[in-house]
Amino acid sequence: MLFEETIKTQHPQAMVDVTQLIRNAVKKSGRKDAHLLVSVPHTTAALTINENADPDVVNDLLRRIEHLVPTTDHSDRHAEGNSHAHLKSSLFGSCHPFIVKDGELVLGTWQGIYLCEFDGPRTRRLLISILAA
């Protein structure tokens, strides 16, 4: 079963909590026990799992990734000027597996699932595939 969500990001770089969208898809699927794959089919966006209780964690992650891979590097050769976004996306990855048990998405107490925007604002697709266990 495949679900697709559209997310309009608002900033050049952001982390959008998509946990509830994924939980909603799990409920709609009616599956009790399943394997779940979440993917973003983009080369300048990614997915990550991280703390969702304190918004400062997201801010710190974005600040630190910008420090590691600065947006502006005059030695980049890619004509579009977004090589930084491709690299950041590659570091995070575009697909993550999850488990559904007793009809619920299994996450740790503080875990949330984030769509990471590195070349926004843009309209992004989030693909949620739910497979019977």
Walk through the language-model features, giving the residues of each.
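Active-site histidine-anchored catalytic micro-motif
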Residues: 1-133
